[in-house]
């Protein structure tokens, strides 16, 4: 069994490599994303909180290439590149955390409901239908407003309440297909426990789909966090975010006369999300190919 899993993992890696070789856009996107994450997190490691909290009015709204500021400064006299790195790190952290929770909850519930089916599955699916029709954005905004001592963890928890539904339904649908395959029937006949069948036999066969889903969920979470922060309902006040940087564009004067304060963040979000989507589409094709050949 261990040798078989090892071969499957090698086959998965090989399939992904081959797809990336064929899809040059996905390959370039992968290299670009790795570079972005390395630059953002390594750069952030060497910054102190005072670097992006302290205000220097004398350097307020300096234009790019002025006094050593390559992209200029913001309304607090802080370097735009520095703020961009910190903001990107914070936005990525929120997206990573929500994506992790989404995948864990979505995979567990999806495999369980898809495996057992029956009345439990019916009731659970009606519950997810109800949650999906709720105005999640409005509810998140309400929670952000009323929760005392709101912080980054609060935001992660609130977003995660609604984020697992899509992943659960996707994993459930694929699990229901796997349940009817011969290897599952053979395991049931041999007396293998339901837990082992679900998470040692079925779930590994969904790994490509899970990876593809993770990339797309991550892209969506970056967009959601950015949107909430742009509206003023994201990260706590004083915490830099790509959304709060873009919020500078709501000031007509800043939007037209000082575009360097918000354009860099907009460009970063656009390119990063597009790169993730290109990678996700390539991984989804790998998942579909592996499913078709089984």
Swiss-Prot record:
One of its GO terms (cellular component) is plasma membrane. It is a multi-pass membrane protein. Gene3D superfamilies: MetI-like. PROSITE patterns: ABC_TM1. One of its GO terms (biological process) is protein transport. The chain crosses the membrane at residues 27-47, 94-114, 127-147, 151-171, 202-224, 260-280. Keywords: Cell membrane, Membrane, Peptide transport, Protein transport, Transmembrane, Transmembrane helix, Transport. The keyword DNA-binding does not apply. Its main location: membrane. Coiled coil: none annotated. It is found in: Cell membrane. Pfam families: BPD_transp_1. Residues 88-280 form the ABC transmembrane type-1 domain. The complex is composed of two ATP-binding proteins (OppD and OppF), two transmembrane proteins (OppB and OppC) and a solute-binding protein (OppA). Belongs to the binding-protein-dependent transport system permease family. OppBC subfamily. Part of the ABC transporter complex OppABCDF involved in the uptake of oligopeptides. Probably responsible for the translocation of the substrate across the membrane. Essential for uptake of peptides larger than three amino acids and for growth in milk. This is Oligopeptide transport system permease protein OppC. The lineage of its organism: Bacteria, Bacillati, Bacillota, Bacilli, Lactobacillales. The gene is oppC.
